[in-house]
């Protein structure tokens, strides 16, 4: 036996031979038409503390992949695993365990907040649902935890008494991130979380994601159609086209020497993109 061989770490999140198909009208006994596949027999491994970017043009399958990884939708074939455990989309017990470990930042984070609800209540809700023991131990005194998570996202605790509809766009984005962080997840899945923001705000949220993932030792999978939003944040980049992952390499290598024409096309959309600082 060679004692100098290094064991490959087990993935924290994985898709194994997953297939997803577009909804078509067919009878129950009819086989799925392979031509309707969004992606077919796709496998992907994500390590616990890595930051990964998933980029591709609209309609390439990015959002469907993310929904499958979130167990929001069951795959037609294949499976999703977290830390070696099979995630069952129809099982409340499985999903509660999974949501404690993996949290989601939606495409329109601000729009995910009920406008008439206080910020404090928006943050307490996932804590009650996913960490009830922590709520019981706090005996109703969880103001310290709320202040802590607000500080992590760069917001004053004075905003806790405001309703979400009173927040600015940037504040709402940060509250949505705080809502994901409050349950102390180990991994974040983000679906174009900065779409609709102006460039200065996008850069602020990008820097904040880097900061909180480093501080909390969390992994991140961030989906974007804009490759510039992943540069400087994600160490590994996946490029998706036509339901296939056509590149999976360190971000610096993808930016410096794209191996696929589709990747080069995505890079041409941001000609000022620089790889300096890596």
List the predicted regions and their residue ranges.
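ABC ATPase NBD coupling module
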Residues: 30-31, 87-103, 117, 121, ...
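Helix-to-loop junction immediately C-terminal to a conserved catalytic motif
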Residues: 70
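Conserved ABC transporter NBD signature motif
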Residues: 78-89
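Conserved ABC ATPase "signature" region
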Residues: 140-158, 267
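Conserved ABC ATPase signature
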Residues: 163-167, 171
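A short, surface-exposed alpha-helical micro-motif characterized by mixed small hydrophobic
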Residues: 230-232
């Amino acid at each position: 036996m060679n004692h100098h061989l290094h064991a490959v770490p087990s993935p924290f999140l994985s898709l194994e031979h997953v297939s997803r198909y577009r909804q078509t009208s067919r009878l129950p006994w009819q086989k799925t038409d392979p031509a309707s596949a969004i992606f077919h027999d796709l496998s992907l491994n994500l390590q616990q503390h890595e930051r990964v970017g998933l980029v591709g043009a609209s309609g390439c399958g990015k959002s469907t992949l993310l929904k499958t990884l979130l167990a929001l939708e069951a795959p037609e074939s294949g499976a999703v695993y977290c830390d070696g455990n099979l995630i069952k989309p129809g099982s409340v017990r499985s999903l509660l365990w999974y949501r404690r470990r993996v949290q989601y930042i939606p495409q329109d984070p601000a729009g995910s907040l009920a406008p008439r609800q206080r910020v404090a209540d928006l943050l307490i809700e996932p804590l009650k649902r996913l960490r009830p023991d922590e709520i019981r131990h706090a005996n109703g005194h969880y103001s310290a935890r709320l202040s802590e998570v607000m500080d992590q996202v760069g917001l004053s605790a004075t905003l806790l008494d405001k309703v979400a509809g009173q927040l600015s766009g940037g504040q709402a984005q940060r509250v949505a991130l705080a809502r994901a962080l409050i349950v102390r997840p180990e991994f974040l899945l983000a679906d174009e979380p900065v779409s609709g923001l102006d460039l200065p705000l996008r850069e602020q949220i990008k820097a904040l994601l880097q900061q909180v993932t480093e501080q909390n030792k969390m992994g991140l999978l961030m989906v974007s159609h804009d490759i510039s939003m992943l540069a400087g944040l994600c160490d590994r980049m996946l490029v998706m086209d036509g339901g296939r992952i056509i590149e999976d390499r360190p971000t610096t290598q993808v930016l410096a020497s794209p191996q696929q024409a589709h990747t080069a096309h995505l890079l041409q959309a941001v000609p000022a993109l620089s790889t300096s600082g890596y």
